[in-house]
Regions:
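An N-terminal-biased, well-structured beta-alpha scaffold segment characteristic
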Residues: 1-34, 159
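Phosphate-coordination loops involved in phosphoryl transfer and adenosine-cofactor binding
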Residues: 7, 85-88, 160, 169
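Short beta->alpha connector loops at strand-helix junctions that form conserved
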Residues: 13-14, 30-42, 135, 176
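Phosphate-binding beta-alpha-beta segment of Rossmann-like dinucleotide-binding domains, i.e.
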Residues: 29, 36-88, 103
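Glycine-rich Rossmann-fold phosphate-binding loop(s) that bind the pyrophosphate
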Residues: 94-95
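N-terminal Rossmann-fold NAD(P) dinucleotide-binding loop
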Residues: 98-99
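NAD(P)-binding Rossmann-fold cofactor-contacting core
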Residues: 107-125
């Protein structure tokens, strides 16, 4: 950046700049840092709904079973699947992506929780989200969407303490920066739950 003396702006395709540029340097030197991420919010939101339905209904496993000639039928094919209807759905981070995702989920449920300490409570309440602590979200939720950007304060904030609070059949979908989650803890807990 120091060598780019005529640089006026940087366009980033991510909503988060921490991992790939010195935002503070840009700010101090009058370099605009702009994000194109909001353009992709609807696309990612629709993918998120697809992932959620696949996890809840075990579509991915049914596909694998079908390919391997181990297709199951009737009760056996639905033993571990569940409905999205009337689930408690939570958003960790309530930015552009959450604002696109929530309306897609409203036909299934109206029980939404949110955690976003960087936003005013009124914004979450105006979007019909009950404000909760991370502990409460991990205890109560059937589906948790991790949508927050990474900061120095939230790196690995989702750790074994929180993950161990999750209900047995709840779903965790990480659609933001992976560093918000401690993956070593996630892998250990995932192996225990199988």
């Amino acid at each position: 950046l120091k060598k780019a003396t005529k640089l006026k702006a940087i366009f980033n395709v991510e909503s988060n700049f921490m991992d790939n540029m010195d935002y503070e340097y840009c700010f101090r030197n009058g370099i605009y840092v702009l994000s194109t991420a909001p353009v992709f919010a609807q696309t990612v939101a629709e993918i998120a709904v697809g992932f959620t339905l696949s996890l809840k209904r075990e579509i991915h496993q049914s596909h694998i079973d079908f390919i391997n000639n181990k297709e199951k039928y009737g009760l056996e094919s639905n033993m571990n699947s569940s409905l999205l209807q009337n689930n408690t759905v939570s958003f960790i981070g309530f930015g552009d992506l959450a604002k696109k995702l929530k309306p897609l989920l409203e036909p299934f449920t109206n029980n939404f929780l949110a955690y976003d300490p960087w936003l005013p409570s009124k914004l979450l309440e105006d979007n019909n989200c009950k404000i909760n602590s991370l502990n409460e979200i991990f205890k109560k939720s059937d589906v948790i969407y991790v949508l927050s950007s990474i900061t120095t304060k939230n790196k690995h904030m989702i750790d074994k303490k929180l993950l161990n609070l999750m209900k047995q059949n709840s779903c965790l979908l990480i659609l933001s920066r992976a560093n918000v989650v401690n993956f070593k803890d996630l892998l250990k807990i995932s192996k225990k739950r199988k």
